[in-house]
Amino acid sequence: MPYSHGKKLKPSLKLAKTISTSSFVSSTTSNSFSPLEDSTSASSSTSSSSSGKSVRFAAHLYTVKKFNTKLAPISISEKAASNLTRNLHNNAIPLTFPFIGGEDHRYSLDILDYSDLEYDNKDVEYDNESDVEDNAMLMHDRSMFIEKEILCFGEEETFDMADWKLVSNNLNPFKSDYKVDVTGLEDKIFKYLNGQNIKVHSLELSDPVSYEDICSNNFGNCQIWGLIFVNNLNFEKKIEIKFTLNNWADIHYINAHYNKSVTPHVDEFKFIIDISALKLNLISKNLIYTNFFERKTTCLLNLQFCCRYDVNGFEYRSFYDNNDYKNYEITISLSAINLNRAVSNSSIFNSNLGPSKMGASNAEVTMSKNNENSKKPLRKFIKDTDYYNDSPLKHKFYQSFETKAACKTEPVSQTFKAETIDCEIEPFNYFFEPPDSQTNEDMSDSSYDLSLQDFNYWEFSNHGLGKALADSDILQFKNYPKPEPFSRPPIIDDTFTLNTDDRTLGSKTQKLEDNLAKEWKSAKTRTTLNETPLHDDEHRTSFTYTTWNNSTDTLMKRKEERPVESASCSQLSIATIKAEEDLLYQDYINSGRESSSPEISPLNTTTSLPFFPGDNMSDSSGEYEERTSLSPNKIHIFRDYFYKSPSP
């Protein structure tokens, strides 16, 4: 027993000590340890020490959930609460819900990914320069699907019902006899009722509307008229008709109204079921529909109904008429008229696509072709446009060295003269356009292939003699990883002799300038060709070229060698040039320097054509001449002037 200053403790303190100890023991034996329990036990011990009350805690404590009074009443179980995800901050998703007073909702079920709903308006932008004829068939096919979707969703539902008629019903109609008196008529009606207080005795269908009436905007309503005999039990009566059109999946209610009093004890009520008023509902349930390829579609409707008779004076009793537990059934046949058939959306889509014809089935769609001889307008660029292309496939789409040259020959007794037309290279203008004639196709330079293999030689092939001369300065490139700037464009004067099977052409290029003005503008080429006969099989030819280009790298492409073609006035070939630099230098030393512009003569010796670098020149003037020869069908080139600075 503890003492305090030699005195005994008060009984209240003893009790508090005992209770706090027992509560501590009970809390330690429990399975749950939480700061909430410790704080609660501590506060209870202090309060018990002052008041002397005993407090007992449960073995398991639960966290108290607090809800805002403005929140919607939602019951959340422990299992559902564990599946809720924290609503992360997103600018696209509002953090407050307006229907709960603007309070923040801490939890939300992530059902939709709102990031998928975001779109860019740029996706709907179209190129104004696109070709309309290319998308003609696509737009024509899509028009049919668009109209079908419009009819399915009812956004532009433009069809009506016509030509309806009553096919069958299971009603046993009442046959009246006008010769009998009122007493006899009443007896006959009660006999027809067969102990019932309500019974349908007549069903009729409204007058149908024909297709011609609808075309003249004379619309009608498809209605079912019914007459009911009612036993006059009380003055206050209520008769309700319950009907369905899809075997009681959907139920509709209408009221019958007083029509007349047949006898003092029998009244007649009348009801109307308007089928036309339920048109949208029938469309949504696919009970009536239209075929897009037909003017009208026949649909069958099966209507079932029964009646209820409520009487006020008989303790609100209700009487039913369900046709002896069989319900009343009516089968109606009607025609759904497609009003879109007159003015179809396809005529709007295909108004600019030429005449078209659409068959009775969606499998047959015939469209007239455009005139094959008519040329489509292509995109054109201005002549001074710079073309820079860094694409790996640039050699397939860029043809800056594609020129058209037409050979115009004039037969003369002593002098033969041929002059090529002035041509300017306009990329993409003739990329898709076929040649006008066979002559243009022959003279137009086709493929221009230039590839570098191990930086030792070039493979150069062309189908035009003039183009090879114009671009001969490209052959200077070898072992130049990066072109260095030069002071002025080099002037190259070339003289060569071409040996072929049938004749030899000797030509001398007099003024070949590679003008690169202002960072190598787009390529332009001007060509003049003059030939004069020297001997029977030899002609003297002179070319004058002026060209500049900035896209030499776009013409580099590794390609196999092409065989040398037979020479002609319209189609010539240049053989593949392969040489090693060391052989060039050795041949250059052995051959020696000669005077420029020697006399042109055919060469029959066969030697490898050297490569012409500008770095191996030691003369101060920078001029020398190389005399080389090839076997027949190959080129012999004499090069006269070179500058040390490489040409790009």
Swiss-Prot record:
Q: List every stretch annotated Disordered.
A: 20-52, 593-629
Q: Which GO terms describe its molecular function?
A: glycogen binding; protein phosphatase 1 binding; protein phosphatase regulator activity
UniProt feature, compositional bias: Low complexity: 20-51
> What's in the keyword line of the UniProt record?
Glycogen biosynthesis
Domain of life per record: Eukaryota
* InterPro entries in the record: CBM21_dom, CBM21_dom_sf, PP1_regulatory_subunit_3
Q: Pfam families given for it?
A: CBM_21
Instruction: Using the record's annotation, list all stretches that form the CBM21 domain.
Output: 201-331
Q: Would you name any one GO CC term?
A: protein phosphatase type 1 complex
For bias type Polar residues, the affected ranges are 593-609
Q: Biological process GO terms, please?
A: glycogen biosynthetic process; regulation of glycogen biosynthetic process
The function of this protein is: Regulates the activity of glycogen synthase. It is most probably a regulatory subunit for protein phosphatase type 1.
**Protein name, UniProt field:** Serine/threonine-protein phosphatase 1 regulatory subunit PIG1
Species in which this protein is naturally found: Saccharomyces cerevisiae (strain ATCC 204508 / S288c) (Baker's yeast)
